């Protein structure tokens, strides 16, 4: 992408070679993003989810001694952002935003619900009951199933002696009804019109704003060598 917007061409881009170069880079960057977004999935990639891409917004400011880039990267960890120079006057900023979720359409009966967690309650556990038998004298006698109790005791003993295995915790059942934040991979390229000092470049990420300061290289001064 060109370093300066199109409105900059008329006021400061007096050199036609720089103007054509900026426009060429800008058009190529736009074409590349469109091709990546509309490429069909064929073959083995049919069942894989395509990588989502987005383009963060940047402001570029020029001073007498530096170029300043300010980009919006909300919710991105600094470890997921890479800044590098591909040539002496071109800087590339790329990164990735990840979020695991399951998207869906909210049903009408749960309108307004943002997340759905938990599982349906299981039916009430069946409890053993005591049966009443009536003897010949019409007296109620409580009977217990001795054989069943012995069988239960054996099962408990077997469970106690068997080695216990740790169960993996289940992932929370969460579902996003609305997903509007940008996620995926991003890459921005800026080409500077003049020489820059790559060794003095500094960058910081605070409150979702990436700030990159690129000092301009000192102008080459002519040095005269005296002949003895």
Curated annotation (Swiss-Prot):
Domain of life: Eukaryota
GO BP term, example: cellular response to heat
Endoplasmic reticulum is among the record's keywords: no
PROSITE patterns listed in its UniProt record: SHSP
Keywords in alphabetical order: Cytoplasm, Stress response
Keyword flag Cytoplasm: yes
InterPro entries in alphabetical order: A-crystallin/Hsp20_dom, HSP20-like_chaperone, Small_HSP
Bias-annotated ranges (Low complexity): 144-158
Disordered: region residues: 34-53, 117-136, 144-174
Compartment annotation: Cytoplasm
Misc. comment: The N-terminal putative helical domain may be the site through which HSP30 binding to mitochondrial membrane is regulated.
Protein name per Swiss-Prot or TrEMBL: 30 kDa heat shock protein
Species of provenance: Neurospora crassa (strain ATCC 24698 / 74-OR23-1A / CBS 708.71 / DSM 1257 / FGSC 987)
């Amino acid at each position: 992408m060109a370093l300066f917007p199109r409105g900059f061409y008329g006021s400061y881009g007096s050199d036609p070679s720089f103007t054509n170069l900026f426009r060429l880079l800008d058009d190529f960057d736009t074409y590349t993003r469109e091709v990546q977004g509309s490429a069909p999935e064929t073959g083995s990639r049919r069942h894989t989810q395509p990588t989502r891409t987005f383009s963060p917004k940047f402001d570029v400011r020029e001073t007498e001694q530096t170029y300043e880039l300010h980009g919006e990267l909300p919710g991105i960890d600094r470890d997921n952002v890479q800044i590098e120079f591909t040539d002496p006057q071109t800087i590339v900023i790329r990164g990735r935003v990840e979020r695991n979720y399951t998207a869906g359409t909210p049903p009408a009966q749960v309108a307004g619900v943002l997340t759905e967690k938990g599982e349906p309650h299981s039916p009430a556990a069946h409890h053993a009951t005591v049966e009443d038998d009536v003897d010949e004298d019409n007296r109620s006698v409580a009977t217990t199933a001795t054989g069943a109790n012995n069988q239960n005791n054996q099962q408990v003993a077997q469970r106690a002696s068997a080695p216990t295995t740790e169960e993996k915790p289940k992932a929370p059942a969460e579902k996003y009804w609305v997903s509007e934040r940008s996620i995926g991979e991003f890459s921005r390229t800026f080409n500077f019109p003049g020489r820059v000092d790559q060794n003095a470049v500094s960058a910081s990420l605070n409150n979702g704003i990436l700030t990159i300061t690129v000092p301009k290289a000192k102008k080459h001064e002519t040095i005269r060598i005296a002949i003895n």
